[in-house]
Amino acid sequence: MTEKAKQSAAVTGSDEIDIGRLVGTVIEARWWVLGTTAIFALCAVIYTFFATPIYSADALVQIEQNAGNSLVQDINSALANKPPASDAEIQLIRSRLVLGKTVDDLDLDIAVTKNTFPLFGAGWERLMGRHNEMVKVTTFTRPETMSGQIFTLKVLGDKRYQLVSDGGFSAQGVVGQPLNKDGVTMRVEAIDARPDTEFTVSKFSTLGMINNLQNNLTVTETGKDTGVLSLTFTGEDRDQIREILNSITRNYLQQDIARKSEEAGKSLAFLAKQLPEVRSRLDVAENKLNAFRQDKDSVDLPLEAKAVLDSMVNIDAQLNELTFKEAEISKLFTKAHPAYRTLLEKRKALEDEKAKLNGRVTAMPKTQQEIVRLTRDVESGQQVYMQLLNKQQELKITEASTVGDVRIVDPAITQPGVLKPKKALIILGSIILGLMLSIVGVLLRSLFNRGIESPQALEEHGISVYASIPLSEWQKARDSVKTIKGIKRYKQSQLLAVGNPTDLAIEAIRSLRTSLHFAMMQAQNNVLMLTGVSPSIGKTFVCANLAAVISQTHKRVLLIDCDMRKGYTHELLGTNNVDGLSDILAGKGEIASCAKPTAIANFDLIPRGQVPPNPSELLMSERFGELIAWASSRYDLVLIDTPPILAVTDAAIVGRHAGTTLMVARYAVNTLKEVETSLSRFDQNGIQVKGVILNSIFRRATGYQDYGYYEYEYQSDSK
């Protein structure tokens, strides 16, 4: 393979590793992801149980095109059909005119709410079947000075109740009877609740309740230009929302009828004023005609004059009819509209015909002219008068039988199901949200806090790796016992080197033992210090098992627990903590008798002793140096377990007495920056760290080999 090909392959492999690492990181944190998702799902389930359900009621109304107006129907029948003005009607339904009457009719400005525990109280009441308890208040007023006070109604039983406020007001009332005290008036029509149940009574402004109705009311047209409107109203009370929607449709219908009736009423008032005047003019015309006939001795008209007279009277009648039509059509159209222009053209034609007839009358003898004029005035007046009488009767009938343009097709009905919350959707959405957030959290944590993922990552920065110890499944199982059955039992359990000597982690520690044999050849003494980067990385585990493995080679090993704050090696090895390191350094114990034998041959332990107030000062004493010198002369290896260097300075103090120093870092937990900072602290104190032990390497979901560790198992045959 050429160099260029190798580089290309390396880049490709690196890209694949990056993608695989992301997937692997999520898979490794699967229990955390699943746990987080389960919490989100549980919260969603709890919410759906306790959230207040919202119901929906719907109704259907139809806008009939110009119902009840024959004139407009006649006009529109001659024109193209004009679609109903649905948009205008929708705004009318949502107007304060309609909704305000609904608020007044149903006393919606008075709200009575049952007092429950915040957040979950209402849901609990529903689960217990007590959510239908109610108090019906039809009247509630209070002085302006009490507008900011909170009024509470307490059910006393026997149809009695007590009304109190946080301002000191208190009064008792009886159902069905008005309560009046200090300017506060209330009338309770019904109570359906247990004694001692409390309700909050609130008074809202009419405008505020209208706005609330507008927010919960939806009006849409069904289809295009159908004139059929669908009304939907949402709320918490199934019965109340049905009543509200029925009231809205009823008030909408009534206002439409009232508007039509008002129009007819105004026309009737106008006719009532005009009829006497028309009758008076008719009487005058009749008197003049009679007087002229008496004066001329009953002059008869010839047939030609009679025909002209009839034509003129007929034209006058038609002109009067057009006047009525123009009054109606002017409300709908401008003069530029085709229908209006047609009417004006017809009027002009009649007026032209009338002018011609007037010319023929002018050619007649004077007596005939006068008789024609007087007779025309009488007959035209009679026709006008009869038309007005007919119109009056017609308007009276219209006023009495007005149905309006609106028809309620479907009265309001509450849908059986719950509109919201949609339980399945909320739970599913919460599961998806929890899954996404947990995965993002895992990836962000991995991105911003990337632990050491391979020995090569350390070696590339010039840091020697003496051993890579895999995570022991056996030890992991013992750790679970710690969680379930308590720390004490866990700490008194067997070492991995004793309980499962063929474990891969012990094999790695044996490899470390071999490496230490050569690493300590040039050391100034046989003292080996093991420290850690940070707490909870398995330093004591490595130290204790390393001591056990070395002691199995028939070398005498002494383990000194220098973690006088949190050391627990004595519990791990099953020895007591009497006359430990702190006691020796404080002068309370003898160095010669401080080492305690363990259950493992050639393996002795000096426990931490009682927790002192000044562990760092004790380690700096000359007596600690004497202890190290004594131990070095009597044992093949002195192993010192110290606290993590990033936590306290004890390791820097002890390191001056050790010929060899190794540092433990945990795989995928400690970062490269932490390791470098720890090494820098040792350098500042003149201590050379030989190398790092990478502990608890586990098989990642992206493949174990990507991190420089190959798993083999080699066991003896059992026969």
UniProtKB/Swiss-Prot annotation:
Residues 1-30, 445-719 are cytoplasmic. One of its GO terms (biological process) is polysaccharide biosynthetic process. Autophosphorylated. Seems to be phosphorylated through a cooperative two-step mechanism. First, Tyr-568 is phosphorylated in an intramolecular reaction that generates a significant increase of protein kinase activity. Then Tyr-707, Tyr-709, Tyr-710, Tyr-712 and Tyr-714 are phosphorylated in an intermolecular Tyr-568-dependent reaction. SUPFAM superfamilies: P-loop containing nucleoside triphosphate hydrolases. The modification Phosphotyrosine is found at Y568, Y707, Y709, Y710, Y712, Y714. Dephosphorylated and activated by wzb. It is a multi-pass membrane protein. One of its GO terms (molecular function) is ATP binding. InterPro entries: AAA_dom, Bact_polysacc_biosynth/exp, GNVR, LPS_length_determ_N_term, P-loop_NTPase, Wzc-like_C. This is Tyrosine-protein kinase wzc. It comes from Salmonella typhimurium (strain LT2 / SGSC1412 / ATCC 700720).
